[in-house]
Amino acid sequence: MGKKSRVKTQKSGTGATATVSPKEILNLTSELLQKCSSPAPGPGKEWEEYVQIRTLVEKIRKKQKGLSVTFDGKREDYFPDLMKWASENGASVEGFEMVNFKEEGFGLRATRDIKAEELFLWVPRKLLMTVESAKNSVLGPLYSQDRILQAMGNIALAFHLLCERANPNSFWQPYIQTLPSEYDTPLYFEEDEVRYLQSTQAIHDVFSQYKNTARQYAYFYKVIQTHPHANKLPLKDSFTYEDYRWAVSSVMTRQNQIPTEDGSRVTLALIPLWDMCNHTNGLITTGYNLEDDRCECVALQDFRAGEQIYIFYGTRSNAEFVIHSGFFFDNNSHDRVKIKLGVSKSDRLYAMKAEVLARAGIPTSSVFALHFTEPPISAQLLAFLRVFCMTEEELKEHLLGDSAIDRIFTLGNSEFPVSWDNEVKLWTFLEDRASLLLKTYKTTIEEDKSVLKNQDLSVRAKMAIKLRLGEKEILEKAVKSAAVNREFYRQQMEEKAPLPKYEEGNLGLLESSVGDSRLPLVLRNLEEEAGVQDALNIREAISKAQATENGLVNGENSVPNGTRSENENLNQEESKRAVEDAKGSSSDNTAEVKE
């Protein structure tokens, strides 16, 4: 999915070319685990911590060079085997072929005309690698004992993939051999390539992803070397950081949620063939047919013979695409930038604002988003800003009296301002906030555009620069949009225009104002929205999984094109104790904003 690359050549079962003592690596991984489990660094210290962790990781990688289980040849050499295996096991293989599209990497090309909404691809459950198949594999005994594997389906899936890759007779070998040998996620970035992301809003997630992955590797290296149920794993003698990074990235870029066989809950899966489709703007057209027990995909649009077949991965930002899928999508209509906002507890009106926000179902501090499209803010952010800028009298009106509930109900609707003065204040605040964020970048929009003209830039460097450029363009648009709104409402105030009042008869108007809420209302924390540290963050071991991404599904038992971690309904305290060595300290406290 997305741009793929295969730099190394790898063959199942090749032996190690280097010798290194497990004890030596155990000492290094213990040091790494300690470093990754330390409290979150203070402001401005994240880069320093990242470099320190990276130095340890690179030291481990250097000592493990040549120890990974590998495949010979190029991934495309194995495409015929994949198609044969898929056909023999009930998947559709007619009407498309796998082709290298250069810029986008490998994808599916139509070999006949395919009509919009035509079912063209289906993959039965038996071909999927799932958490359930992991439980029933050689990984089963360790899975039954390790609370991390039980709590985090994505990690279980990553180890399932590694164990099956190391087994030449694995049922899934025809699929695994066609996976990329490496990816373009930030886990594979050189330090200089990551440096391009300094000062961006996305850099915090990049640091978190790298730290979490390093911590997980260090934790599981010890488990594999010391746990009695790990003795029979094919990873016992060779579990390298390179292996884990590859497995994590394979899952991160490909995992999806499907219903379990009885349809009672969701589980994570890798879906052969389907995961070859590249992304474009549109709607989710993939679902899971429980009756036939298979994943099904209908065409997003008409595709003529010879054209690439695209699917829609979901309403993801480019930060999410880069960090979790390893590609940047130009003209992303769902692009957005995170903005952390909170009501300061030192605010004289904090208690009243907190109560109004609570009644509206909005936290006093959270991570919101500024959007690429108009309007730049969601209904929830609009509601937050209105409350944030309210006077004491306006707060009382939303807490007391017969009309208080109606006022709460319309907080997120742009058609019903609290007051003209309140609108002027909130748009002024947003304009100032976005302007301040723009000033934190070390380069300008013009400078980024100039740098992108350099033909010598690596693919990953170009992605990083495009990402920071995209953030700035969204912030700049937000500044301009806020300025226009500020002036509009200032004029309304000066002209003493009458305020629109909500009445029950306005319900149609309220329902028609969907533009304010057509995108995710809030990013509740820095990792929830990001697909797979979404995938691979230990803290998510004790959080409730969501069955769909961004609420976009294609039918009752749909597969969203993008997932969160599996919910195993663990007791929170039990899980917390079980994962103490591996979990990270919370780093997503939002900054308070003082009025």
UniProtKB/Swiss-Prot annotation:
Belongs to the class V-like SAM-binding methyltransferase superfamily. SETD3 actin-histidine methyltransferase family. Its main location: cytoplasm. The SET domain specifically recognizes and binds actin, suggesting that it does not accommodate substrates diverging from actin. Its EC number is 2.1.1.85. Residues 10-20, 549-572, 584-595 have a biased composition (Polar residues). It comes from the Eukaryota. Protein-histidine N-methyltransferase that specifically mediates 3-methylhistidine (tele-methylhistidine) methylation of actin at 'His-73'. Histidine methylation of actin is required for smooth muscle contraction of the laboring uterus during delivery. Does not have protein-lysine N-methyltransferase activity and probably only catalyzes histidine methylation of actin. Interacts with MYOD1. It is found in: Cytoplasm; Nucleus. Signal peptide: none annotated. GO terms for cellular component: chromatin; cytoplasm; nucleus. Keywords: Actin-binding, Cytoplasm, Methyltransferase, Nucleus, Phosphoprotein, S-adenosyl-L-methionine, Transferase, Ubl conjugation. The keyword GTP-binding does not apply. CDD domains: SET_SETD3 (cd19176). This is Actin-histidine N-methyltransferase.
